[in-house]
Each structure stands twice: as C-alpha cells, then as structure tokens.
Amino acid sequence: KVSALDAKAKALANEEDEDTKIAKLLKNMPKWRFYSLAVLTVIWTVFQLYIKLVKPLDPWFQLPLHMCLALVVVWLYNPMVEKSKSHNKLWWIYDIFLIASSCFICWFFLSHAEQLNYRIFNVDVMTTTEVIVAVLLVINVMEAVRRVVSMSLFWVICFFLAYAWFGQYIPGLFRFSGISFPKLMEVLMYGENGIFGSPLVTSLGTLFYFLVFGTFFSNCGGGGVLIDGGMKLSDKTVGGPAKAAVISSGLLGMVSGSAIANVS
C-alpha cells in the first residue's frame, strides 16, 4: 500500500527529474552557447518586464522582438548538430541560417513598423519582400515546432499547408477554389489567427509571464508547498495518497504549465 510519504516523495521526484534533465543539458553545453543563452534570456526577461511594467511599445515592435528572441533561444538550446548522429559541421550552416533569418525577420518588422500600422489586411498587395519574409517566418516556426514540440505536429502543419495549396485539385467535398501563394503567405503572417495574430499576442502578454513565474516559484521551493497542501487536503480520505498525488500535481501544473508531466 502506498503511503502518504511515498506519494509525496514520488511527486517531488517527478519535479526534480525534469530539473535534473535541464541542468545536465546546460552543464554539457559548450560555454559560448551557455553564456549566449544566459544573456539572451536575461535580455528577453528585461524586455518583457519593461513593456509590462514601464511602457508598452508599438505592437509591431513588441511582437517581432518576442518572436525573434524566442526563435534564437530555440536554435541555441536545440542546435541541429546535436540532433544529427554525425557531427557534420555543415549542420552549423543551417543553424546560422536560421539565426540570421530570425534576425532579418525582426529587422524587417522593426524597420517597417509605421507602414504596417496602416496596412489593410486583404486589401494591400503583398510585396516581394513581404513574401520572402513570410516564407522565412514559416520555415523558422515550423523548424522550431519540429525541434521543440514533436514531429507529429510538424507533419500536421505540413498537411494543412499542402491542403491550402493543392485543395483546388482535390475532387469532392474537400475541394475549394484555391488560394494564391502570396495570399497564403499574407494569411499566415498577417491574419488574425496567423503567426503574428492571437497566438503570438497571447504568448507575449500572458504565457511568458506565466512560465517565468512558474519557474521562479518551483525553484524557490513553492512546489513543496503545493505538494504539502495536497497532502493535507486528502490525508484523511479513502485513497488519500493517490488523491494527494493528483491534487499536488494539478496545483504544481497551474504554475509550471506542465500538469501532465507531474502526474504519473
């Protein structure tokens, strides 16, 4: 029979395993990458706190900077050279291209912020430069999804992109009139549900602070407090240890963003 102490120890072990995994990865990381990540994350945090507590900036300044910093952190934290079994230096060219293209995308939006404020979606025609930026943006986001999330989501995105392009050739119920390539890029980049739409706005205004708070809370011992609270709520009930594990993991997930990872 699992005791209450065993349930508490298991919940703490799950939390520590994730921290140990990250700590091990950072320890084995080359120093230049480690310090680059440290500097970037500090700059990112200061930038986010500034626009939240001091002075909000133009959306076309905030969103591209948020996106660029996130992408560069992904490329440094998950380099392609470590994903491949062979340590081929040519993979670094791909990572350098991704970092450079992320910065180019950010520069484009920052330098055209004023014009973009007056741009009318579905009315203004996409310029050649905008199409190129949109293509680079889609490549960067899809590669970030592939490295950080999963290949399954990557292929789901590929499927729907292919459907948007080839849907006009599909017979039957799923056929539609089709969409031009520049128009598709406009929807993906400028659309309300596109890359610079509500998903990125939510990440900028809510998700980032949620994750930062959860990290500080857990590293300051807050996870143990939530686990103790879960134990107290269920210690006198039938199946108390199991309930304590679920309650504690749910409470911890509310601030860490990973409830499922803590329930096992």
Locations of the language-model features?
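Conserved, well-structured core domains of diverse proteins
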Residues: 1-124, 131-135
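Residue-identity detector for threonine
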Residues: 20, 41, 45, 127-129, ...
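Generic amphipathic alpha-helical segments used as scaffolds and interaction surfaces in large
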Residues: 30-33, 123, 145, 200, ...
